[in-house]
Amino acid sequence: MAAKILALWLLLAGTVFPQGCCQHWSYGLSPGGKRDLDNFSDTLGNMVEEFPRVEAPCSVFGCAEESPFAKMYRVKGLLASVAERENGHRTFKK
């Protein structure tokens, strides 16, 4: 009986201690979940480069010249969604 209890304690300790003393570090994260802000602009630059490019959007859609305010609004929305994703927040549109 004592051997079974000892084996149970060892099994319990073997499963709890390795999980409690380790931390998973994702790419770009420092210990404690802090992100290096110097590389944040590089990350945004890489994201913008991955978007598909169209030479003249109006030639494809037949629209008028897009105002600079609409472009700024889209960039602001993109930056807000990136910041929310970084902080773990999600917003749901109705």
Swiss-Prot record:
Pfam families: GnRH. The modification Pyrrolidone carboxylic acid is found at Q23. The modification Glycine amide is found at G32. Synthesized in preoptic neurons and is transported to the pituitary in the preoptic-hypophyseal axons. GO terms for molecular function: gonadotropin hormone-releasing hormone activity; gonadotropin-releasing hormone receptor binding. One of its GO terms (cellular component) is extracellular region. It comes from the Eukaryota. Keywords: Amidation, Cleavage on pair of basic residues, Hormone, Pyrrolidone carboxylic acid, Secreted, Signal. Residues 1-22 form the signal peptide. It is found in: Secreted. Belongs to the GnRH family. Stimulates the secretion of gonadotropins. May be responsible for the regulation of the hypothalamic-pituitary-gonadal axis. This is Progonadoliberin-1. It comes from Haplochromis burtoni (Burton's mouthbrooder).
